[in-house]
């Protein structure tokens, strides 16, 4: 189910030389990450069809804001209590290119460990400074505990 997302209000930064420099550094790092994703995506091994992937939007603690995530669910998962792994992609809380990039890893974890894997797209700096990304992960944990 795709819900419209409302961008949360960005934190006002002073347009200092330091902040502008930080924006250029982040833009460069994000560009390099997208290039890496594009080049290595073709080289990754193909995944089997034993894991179902669903895109969801779950509510944030901020009214009217939703967080995007992918749920990886093994098709032959046994009944009973089900373990959950929340994947926090390695972007240093600043590069959007890594969300969804660990798809092969998530497939392997879900398939081999017979658990749900939640791949969460949290907010990134510098547009959304700390602790906002951490709060998004906390919201993901709360959502998992409620469901």
Can you name each region flagged by the protein language model?
Residues 1-47:
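N-terminal targeting or regulatory segments adjacent to alpha/beta-hydrolase or S9 domains
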